[in-house]
Amino acid sequence: MKVRLGVDMMGGDHDPLVVWEALGEVLLSSTGEQPVEFTVFATSDVHHQLMNSPLSRSVRIVTAEDFVSMEDSLLAAVRKKRSSMALGLDALQQGDLDGFVSSGNTAALVTLARSKIPMIPAVPRPALLVSVPTLSGFAVILDVGATVSVNPDEMVGFARMGLAYRQSLSSNSNQPFTLGLLNIGSEERKGTDSHKQTFRMLRNIFGSAFLGNIESGDVFSGKVDIVVTDGFTGNVFLKTAEGLFDFLRHILGDRLEKSIKMQFDYTIYPGSIISGLSRLVIKCHGKSHGTALFGGISGAIDLARANVCSRIADRFGDNVV
């Protein structure tokens, strides 16, 4: 199937041309595969820069009146009705796109997406879901920044979404998956009152599939397939993990074998998925460089082609008990 993907050129910490270069690399790498139709959203000054590129013949460019900056408040972002982010989400909502990718302001993207894109029925709150490499493959962790403070019911919703996501990508419909609650210790009594209540609810709902509390170090061991956490803790965990990998890559350099670098390179995974929406929205890190943008865009294509949001909706209904 042809995938129609929208990309927000604006709002990240990088130059918009970095996104443009990543798009070119994705198009080159996908030669011979099923076609991909890109639509990019950029301000007029960036649009003029892109028109001289040979790539402009292969990519549709939509001119935006403005863009959402990292410094914009939510109110300011919402008021920018013709921003690159808003226009991209409008096109997604209208069915003109199969997915939308942005590396802009996270809070603005989540808020605008939630206001424009219908939620999957029975999902209490959206969450940012990201894949992280482990010794046994990969795990998904959510939430990593959509909502700072959540209640136990919402955490259970995250668990169901994470399970539905893993199930939707599995070729084996009966494959078992395990869950863990990110906490300051593995003992049941650890954590806040909210964590303790969430622990009890997850144990009652998921039974033996819930392996209890896990500490940050357990995530990379592959002990569990789905890690449940609130957006504040999850975001701190994710940025710490990314920073540690970058530190090791810088310190060890060429002494790290390529296969090891690839195994623990978070940039080869898609960006964070705003899970819970009925349409695909991917948030790339604002500081994403070319490789991470390539991974985010390529991953978005794969997820759109797999119709992952519809499959999550189907699976989510099965997981509500």
From Swiss-Prot:
Keyword terms of this UniProt record: Cytoplasm, Lipid biosynthesis, Lipid metabolism, Phospholipid biosynthesis, Phospholipid metabolism, Transferase
Enzyme class: transferase
Enzyme Commission code(s) on record: 2.3.1.274
An MF annotation (GO) of this entry: phosphate:acyl-[acyl carrier protein] acyltransferase activity
GO cellular component assignments: cytoplasm
Principal subcellular localisation of the protein: cytoplasm
Pathways per UniProt: Lipid metabolism; phospholipid metabolism
InterPro entries attached to this UniProt entry: FA_synthesis, Phospholipid_synth_PlsX-like
Cell location: Cytoplasm
Gene3D superfamilies xrefs: Isopropylmalate Dehydrogenase
Keyword Coiled coil: no
Keyword Mitochondrion (UniProt): no
UniProt GO BP: fatty acid biosynthetic process; phospholipid biosynthetic process
Catalysed reactions listed for this entry: a fatty acyl-[ACP] + phosphate = an acyl phosphate + holo-[ACP]
Similarity comment: Belongs to the PlsX family.
Summary of the function given for this chain in its UniProt record: Catalyzes the reversible formation of acyl-phosphate (acyl-PO(4)) from acyl-[acyl-carrier-protein] (acyl-ACP). This enzyme utilizes acyl-ACP as fatty acyl donor, but not acyl-CoA.
Subunit architecture: Homodimer. Probably interacts with PlsY.
Protein's UniProt name: Phosphate acyltransferase
Organism: Chlamydia trachomatis serovar D (strain ATCC VR-885 / DSM 19411 / UW-3/Cx)
